[in-house]
């Protein structure tokens, strides 16, 4: 499966995978409103053997086949506050 990957101009770390032959205006309006301006990032060939950095390729392919897209959300922010010792809190 050949996909176009778009980077969200609205939210860093958010990416949208769509089949190569699908136009962005065919995607649901609420999705595109949440995603914001889509900046083309790359074209990728997805195969079951392919490794992706933050998603299972099987999950991505399944989502594209069922919904027509895969939305990769940004990773959760690291909670540096958990690392700060607090002598008033039991451990």
UniProtKB/Swiss-Prot annotation:
Xref: Pfam families: YcgL
Protein name from the UniProt record: YcgL domain-containing protein Sde_1339
Cross-referenced PANTHER family: PROTEIN YCGL
InterPro entries linked: YcgL-like_sf (IPR038068), YcgL_dom (IPR027354)
Region (Disordered): 72-91
Source organism (scientific name): Saccharophagus degradans (strain 2-40 / ATCC 43961 / DSM 17024)
Superkingdom of origin: Bacteria
Boundaries of every YcgL domain copy: 1-85
Gene3D superfamilies referenced in this protein's UniProt entry, alphabetically: YcgL domain (3.10.510.20)
């Amino acid at each position: 499966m050949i996909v176009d990957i778009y980077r969200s101009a609205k939210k860093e770390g958010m990416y949208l995978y769509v089949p190569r032959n699908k136009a962005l205006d065919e995607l649901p309006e609420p999705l595109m409103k949440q995603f914001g301006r889509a900046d083309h990032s790359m074209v990728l060939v997805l195969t079951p053997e392919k490794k992706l950095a933050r998603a299972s390729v099987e999950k991505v392919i399944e989502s594209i086949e069922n919904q027509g897209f895969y939305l990769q959300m940004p990773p959760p922010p690291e909670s540096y506050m958990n690392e700060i010792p607090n002598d008033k809190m039991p451990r």
